[in-house]
Amino acid sequence: CLEYHRDSEINVPAANDAIFLLAKQQEIVDGKIDRNQAYDFAREKVEQVLEENPSIEVIIDLHRDGVPEDRHLVTEINGKPTAQIMCFNGLSYTTNNGPVEYLPNPYIQDNLAFSFQLEYQAAQYYPDLYRGIYLAGLRYNLHLRPKAILLEAGAQTNSVEEVKNAMEPFADILNRVLTGQS
């Protein structure tokens, strides 16, 4: 179900490098553009990719959490220090104002179901990996597919190695959910 590309021209790190260079050229990084606009900028590109590849069923928006500097979100899996992960779901609803009408998301329930399925599989196979599901008021581009999540992989206090180590069990969990394995 999941394919890993060793070719450095097409793998995720290569894509990350390309995105960083493009963002730097457009002055999106280094604090020059309001981060609140990041989802608007990303949405345009994601919609283009989805239009060109309509068979894409899953969107994973990968982030790291922001935590106090003395907090380290790490566990050990297969003898390796591994960053803990958390799904972040946007509800297009706030307690103070109710529905966020200008940010509709027809897939709120689908997105939540997907997150809960991931959480369930994590609890079965990697009980210390998953930090839970965080619910927030906006939509974070999760309206683009029924299986869309924002994944917090560790935090700024985790090493790159710890975050990379989290991707192996996450890929296993994702595969189990997408293929119906238990």
Question: Where in the sequence are the language-model features?
Answer:
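Structural recognition of the beta-strand scaffold that forms the well-ordered cores
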Residues: 20-22, 58-61, 86-88, 132, ...
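Extracytoplasmic/secreted envelope proteins and their assembly/folding machinery
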Residues: 6-13, 40-47, 115, 119, ...
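Catalytic-core regions of hydrolytic enzymes
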Residues: 14-74
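Active-site-adjacent mobile loop/cap segments within catalytic or ligand-binding domains
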Residues: 129-182
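Active-site-adjacent substrate-binding region
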Residues: 107-134
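Solvent-exposed loop/turn segments at secondary-structure junctions
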Residues: 20, 28-31, 64-69, 91-95, ...
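A short, glycine/acidic-enriched catalytic loop
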Residues: 68-104
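Second-shell loop/turn segments in exported
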Residues: 1-2, 9, 28-40, 45-49, ...
